[in-house]
A protein has these predicted regions:
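Catalytic cores of nucleic-acid endonucleases
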Residues: 141-145, 158-173
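Conserved catalytic cores of phosphodiester-cleaving nucleases, focusing on short active-site segments
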Residues: 130, 134, 148-163
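Short glycine/proline-enriched coil/turn segments at helix->beta-strand junctions
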Residues: 66, 135-139, 150-153, 167-173
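Accessory nucleic acid-recognition modules appended to NTPase machines
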Residues: 3-146
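Proteins with a high burden of low-complexity, intrinsically disordered sequence enriched in S/T/G/P/A and R
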Residues: 1, 31, 156-158, 165
Length: 173
């Protein structure tokens, strides 16, 4: 399994404990923030869990969580570093050398099933798995014509019936 306790009988409970520890204790402690931040971060994670994959609109996330719109991008970075989410960026670069965030994903498929099983759409699960596996050794960016781009190659993630239409105009698809 993805986590060292993946075969334990109490797997789901243990995973939820890891999530709670990370969001409510670890990140706020690292930021030297108060306990109330942990609750807001967990709220942000749940909004992401129920919406993924989606293009983040900071104002809407702020309204849904009570977190300042200006703080949300930083908190998303901390959540990403903690292994809770993944941010798919475009390849433009920008001031910080990071492209604009195009989509948010939960970090791995286990988190999908633990946090929001009712939103465990198979397409979401496929994209999350692809992103989780490919980003280890590759710089994965969003594609303007499909789902992902890696080293100039375009990837469309789908089931048997998806076909090639989405990537037919890709130079390398």
């Amino acid at each position: 399994g993805y986590y060292p306790f993946g075969r334990d009988e109490e797997y789901e409970m243990e995973l939820l404990q890891v999530i709670n520890q990370t969001m409510e204790v670890d990140i706020p402690t690292h930021l030297q923030a108060n306990v109330s931040l942990g609750k807001k971060l967990k709220s942000l994670l749940m909004v992401v869990a129920k919406s993924v994959p989606f293009k983040p609109v900071m104002q809407r996330l702020a309204e849904a969580t009570g977190i300042s719109r200006n703080d949300i991008p930083d908190y998303l970075v901390y959540m990403e570093r903690a292994g809770m989410i993944t941010q798919l960026r475009n390849s433009t670069g920008g001031i910080r050398g990071l492209g604009k965030v195009e989509k948010l994903y939960l970090d791995n498929t286990n988190l999908i099933y633990a946090l929001s099983p009712e939103h465990a759409d198979i397409g979401n699960v496929r994209e999350t798995f692809f992103m989780n596996q490919m980003r280890v050794m590759n710089d994965v960016t969003s594609s303007s014509i499909s789902d992902f781009e890696i080293n100039g190659k375009t990837f469309a993630i789908g089931g048997r019936k998806k076909g090639q239409k989405q990537i037919e105009n890709a130079e390398e698809g």
